[in-house]
């Protein structure tokens, strides 16, 4: 659990996870546009999220599609709920 939480401690990774929560399954190009980051940087962050078990990937032709795992959904929801309580 701690390693998964550390993976979302990075602001870019948190933004990517939130985008996947909103958009469902997205490709690197879509995530790079949302995060306003370079494709290679987004790919690096997605690898970290995948290693932590927070996202899955699948190949669709030349593109790789990413989605949150159930664990990723749960952890992100917990973090966002905690943040909302702190700012309320």
Task: Enumerate the language-model features and the residues they cover.
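Hydrophobic residues on short alpha-helical segments
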Residues: 17-21, 49
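A short acidic, leucine-rich amphipathic alpha-helix
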Residues: 16, 30-32
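Short helix-coil-helix linker/hinge
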Residues: 6-12, 69-71
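Amphipathic alpha-helical dimerization/coiled-coil segments
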Residues: 1, 21-22, 67-88
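Beta-hairpin "wing" of winged helix-turn-helix
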Residues: 30, 50-60, 67
